[in-house]
């Protein structure tokens, strides 16, 4: 399967969003731009050919996914080509045009809006994920130093135990805990990979 991570992707050029969407679609509309004038509407369609060859696709989005990344997510979602996982996207669906002014100035105007294949406007709404998964922050629970037999008052000492064994053991445990804290854990990505494995396993059993 394929996991397409569009989280914190602020977007880019429209033609690149169309190419990325087209890579996973065989046919149909990818996105349309509509302005006040009906005649100025533009529609962009996919060409035949699926890069993933019907493999399951998960698209990750969050509040930092905007503009071109929302076009990709919206197109794959409307065509039911991918499952969108994460949180609501940013909602930047406006087409802005720079118009030169006399002299050395220019003005940027919003001239149209982006619409997904099903006719949804992205502007100020964004893409709603099929499966909402918020990023979880996992932390190690600090339990302090655990009490052992050797910590009890009047406990018998081990005659064969090296000196300061307990202190060295504590330092070792502290180092292991520090290493565990350093390892980042991406909960949303982990959920996406688990979902990909589940879908792939199911499809394999059905085909057999």
Where are these regions (language model features)?
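C-terminal "post-core" interaction segments
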Residues: 1-208
């Amino acid at each position: 399967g394929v996991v397409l991570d569009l989280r914190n992707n602020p977007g880019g050029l429209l033609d690149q969003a169309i190419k990325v969407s087209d890579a996973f679609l065989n046919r149909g509309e990818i996105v349309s731009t509509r302005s006040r004038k009906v005649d100025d509407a533009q529609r962009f369609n996919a060409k035949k050919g699926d890069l993933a060859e019907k493999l399951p696709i998960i698209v990750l989005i969050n509040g930092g996914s905007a503009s071109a990344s929302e076009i990709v997510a919206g197109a794959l979602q409307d065509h039911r080509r991918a499952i969108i996982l994460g949180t609501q996207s940013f909602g930047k669906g406006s087409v802005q045009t720079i118009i030169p002014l006399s002299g050395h100035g220019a003005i940027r105007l919003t001239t149209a809006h982006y619409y997904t294949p099903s006719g949804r406007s992205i502007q100020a709404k964004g893409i709603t994920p099929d499966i909402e998964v918020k990023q979880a922050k996992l932390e190690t629970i600090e339990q302090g130093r655990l009490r052992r037999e050797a910590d009890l008052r009047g406990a018998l000492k081990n005659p064969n135990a090296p000196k300061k064994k307990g202190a060295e053991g504590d330092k070792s445990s502290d180092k292991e805990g520090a290493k565990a804290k350093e390892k980042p854990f991406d909960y949303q990505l982990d959920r996406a990979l688990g979902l990909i494995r589940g879908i792939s396993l199911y499809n394999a059993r059905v085909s057999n």
